[in-house]
Amino acid sequence: LEDGTLVPLPEKNIDTGAGLERIASVLQKKKNNFETDLFMPIIKGVEEVLEIKKEEFDETVKIIADHIRATVFLIGDGVLPSNEGRGYVLRKIIRRAFGVGSSSKGKVFEKEDVFLHKLVSYVVNNMKEAYPELEEKREYISSYKMTSLNNYLNYEKNQLLKIANQLKESGYEVKEYI
């Protein structure tokens, strides 16, 4: 109460800290969160879009599935990549997902490597029943993701060019990949 008095709650509850994913894995008798129906459709999407198999790139596929899901929800809730706060966290999540996906294919940062926006529909289709607002924001999330990734790629490409030029000026031989 306002005066600091504690009053027992009408319902006695205990927060186990288990979370939705852990509860789903127990109820569905799965070994981990990524084998549940919360993640498997997204994992299948990662495999299709990147043309890789979870068995060969287990950690990569799990990271991308987890990060794309978080990204879709964050952008859907109005969080945009920025240099501070939640926006900074989102930016780091996007970069990590893109980075592990690109490295799994042995690719250099190129525009045609952008793939995360293609995974938005897998998340939305899987979660729209429980979160119908995701369906309403599908196009916005996907287009924002594409814009954000293109900006990131341009930044990274410029950074790589700077490093390559510095190495050349120092007498190192640098192969042209960009």
How does the language model describe each region?
Residues L1-K92, S104-M127, Y131-L134, S142, ...:
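Structured aminoacyl-transfer and RNA-binding surfaces used for tRNA recognition/handling
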Residues V100:
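Short alpha-helical functional segments enriched in proximate histidine and acidic residues
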Residues A97:
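Aromatic/basic-lined ligand-recognition segments
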